[in-house]
UniProtKB/Swiss-Prot annotation:
GO terms for cellular component: plasma membrane. The gene is nhaP2. Keywords: Antiport, Cell inner membrane, Cell membrane, Ion transport, Membrane, Potassium, Potassium transport, Transmembrane, Transmembrane helix, Transport. This is K(+)/H(+) antiporter NhaP2. One of its GO terms (molecular function) is potassium:proton antiporter activity. Signal peptide: none annotated. Its main location: membrane. Belongs to the monovalent cation:proton antiporter 1 (CPA1) transporter (TC 2.A.36) family. NhaP2 subfamily. The chain crosses the membrane at residues 6-26, 34-54, 58-78, 95-115, 122-142, 163-183, 189-209, 231-251, 280-300, 303-323, 334-354, 363-383. It comes from Ectopseudomonas mendocina (strain ymp) (Pseudomonas mendocina).
Length: 581
């Protein structure tokens, strides 16, 4: 390759990335998933598009896909809070194992019949498309305001179900290549090895990487590079010894993100950019790899297979996988079933048969690609509507307009939060000394217009003020309530109910206030504990139960404890005046 060809490669690559970014700004206005846009740009630049680029280098696509997926999972792990495991760990693991097997099996049976394949070939297609995609889930769920049980289950499932799909795919390819027709008893051992080594090396390697980062004094910009390179080392070593590198790098990120670490905000900031670049690069390459005219002959059976998987196989796997977990409402199960987003992982797995030289390998690849497109277009675009219909969203927590880390010491967790005060804020007109600031927080600066004020305790806040507060992440809920908008009738109150009660209130007192019958219940127990017991499992904000003809909604949580409960009366009923006290 001469200098001119290299320069042209740089130019084409930069143009494709820039085009993807610019087009995505228009596409998102029409509700088109951003990953579909990246994929479409790659297809337009490919063989059948105006770009006419011929790209059929499957090993390179495999390399790019795995590298991008590793970066995406590392970032996703660092942004996942361990506290979410309280409600979602075991359900997610059930879906990541049993759920994938059921989805792959049912989809494989249908694929064998629709495409006139052998049972093993059909099951291979099922295994290829059997797992949800972390890149798609993290990208499309961000900022949707889903309740914690649903969002955590979907995110942890997508970050941990790829090992099962990879294991099934590799096993079936080996069986087809060797002519083996029966399953070996070694398979469960190999499965345990994949998950066991992935978990052990991911957590162990992550701990060693954390210690190294916190002991090394480097230039600020080098810490993110050390995290990425360390994560990739763990990914590669785990894969080399027969474990799941995908699971290992996700758990590595999870450990790093939930422990005190140097330059946390710098690491997350750079990882955010790298993750976007990884998603763009991965979907561009996969878009270049496909030849659209080859999809036309298989369009009808592939569409039928996609609909079978979306409407039957995935929902059945969800309902069976979540059967032991009674805290999940049917509407939550339906929504989780619908958000079985397929993305880059099935396409990457579909490269495996091509690299192994299996018969019908191109068919497997084309079918997987078609299913991914249908999934992103159908499920991705309808996600906001599905969330609304299934009532799995909750009012967003008030958040600062910006936040930045303060490197006071190597593992400092101090942050600077910036709040813009609108006219509807509770605190407008209040003197600074009157603010009930959370313990350990301080007002660092107050801007009015373009001027930096020198505030005193008597300074009164005005609409439009910019308030800078120093605190910790755990102070955000209290600060949000302090500087949040005054709730308008019909917004948050409409969601949580007509009134919001303290979770510590005695059940007997609440029953007396509303004229309810306890029917032998312990009246001395707190209302929050009673509601949590009625929900079953671990409660989250937005959980609802019906009791005594009223709807009771968890309005606020503090750790595992229900702190506030909303109550809604039936339409047309008129609560007594005592309720307004």
């Amino acid at each position: 390759m001469d200098a001119s060809a290299i320069n042209n490669l740089f130019l084409i690559g930069a143009l494709l990335v820039a085009a993807s970014i610019l087009v995505s700004a228009f596409g998102t206005r029409f509700g088109i998933p951003i990953l579909v846009i990246f994929l479409a740009v790659g297809m337009l630049a490919g063989t059948d598009g105006p770009g006419g680029i011929v790209f059929n280098n499957y090993p390179l696509a495999y390399l790019v896909g795995n590298l991008a997926l590793a970066v995406i999972l590392l970032d996703g792990g660092m942004r996942t809070r361990v506290s979410s495991f309280r409600v979602a760990l075991w359900p997610s693991l059930s879906l990541a194992t049993v759920g994938v097997v059921i989805t792959a099996g049912l989809t494989g049976l249908a694929a064998a019949w629709l495409f006139n394949l052998t049972l093993l070939e059909g099951l291979l297609i099922g295994a290829i498309v059997g797992s949800t995609d972390a890149a798609a889930v993290f990208s499309l769920l961000g900022g949707r305001g889903l309740n914690e049980r649903v969002s955590s289950t979907l995110e942890i499932e997508s970050g941990s179900n790829d090992p099962m799909a990879v294991f099934l795919t590799v096993t079936l390819i080996a069986m087809l290549a060797s002519g083996q027709t029966g399953f070996s008893w070694d398979l469960p051992i190999q499965l345990v090895q994949q998950f066991g080594l992935g978990a052990l090396l991911g957590l162990g390697g992550g701990w060693l990487l954390l210690k190294l980062i916190n002991r090394m004094e480097l230039a600020t910009g080098l810490y993110p590079l050390l995290v990425v390179s360390g994560g990739l080392i763990i990914f590669a070593i785990t894969t080399a010894v027969g474990g799941s590198g995908i699971l290992a790098i996700y758990l590595c990120g999870l450990l790093l993100g939930n422990r005190p670490i140097r330059s946390r905000h710098g690491i997350l900031h750079m990882l955010d950019g790298l993750t976007w670049l990884a998603q763009i690069g991965m979907f561009l390459v996969l878009g270049l790899l496909i030849t659209p005219h080859e999809l036309l002959p298989i369009a009808l059976p592939a569409l039928a297979l996609a609909l079978w998987m979306i409407l039957f196989a995935r929902p059945l796997s969800i309902f069976l996988g979540l059967l032991p977990f009674r805290a999940f409402h049917d509407r939550e199960r339906i929504f989780i079933a619908w958000v079985g987003l397929r993305g880059a992982v099935p396409i990457i797995l579909a490269v495996f048969p091509l690299m192994a030289g299996l018969p019908n390998a191109q068919l497997f690849f084309n079918v997987a690609f078609f299913i991914v497109i249908v999934s992103l277009l159908l499920q991705g675009t309808s996600l906001p509507l599905a969330a609304k219909l299934m009532r799995v969203t909750v009012p967003p927590e008030p958040a600062p307009v910006s936040r930045a880390g303060l490197e006071v010491h190597p593992t400092s967790q101090w942050e600077l939060f910036v709040y813009r005060l609108g006219a509807e804020k509770w605190c407008i007109g209040a003197a600074l000394r009157e603010l009930n600031m959370p313990e350990g927080t301080r007002i660092a600066a107050l801007f009015r217009g373009r001027e930096l004020l020198h505030p005193s305790g008597s300074t009164r806040l005005e609409a439009g003020d910019l308030l800078c507060v120093i605190g910790h992440e755990h102070d955000l809920p209290a600060l949000g309530k302090l500087f949040s908008q005054a709730p308008k009738r019909g917004q948050d109150l409409r969601f949580f109910g007509d009134f919001v009660l303290e979770g510590d209130a005695e059940l007997a007192a609440v029953a007396a206030l509303y004229g309810l019958k306890l029917d032998g219940l312990d009246g001395h127990q707190p209302l929050g504990r009673f509601i949590a017991h009625e929900i079953g499992g671990e409660p989250v904000v937005g959980d609802q139960v019906e009791w005594q003809g009223l709807t009771w909604t968890v309005a606020s949580m503090e750790g595992n404890k229900v702190r506030k409960v909303g109550v809604r009366f039936p339409e047309g009923s008129r609560p007594g005046p005592g309720l307004f006290l």
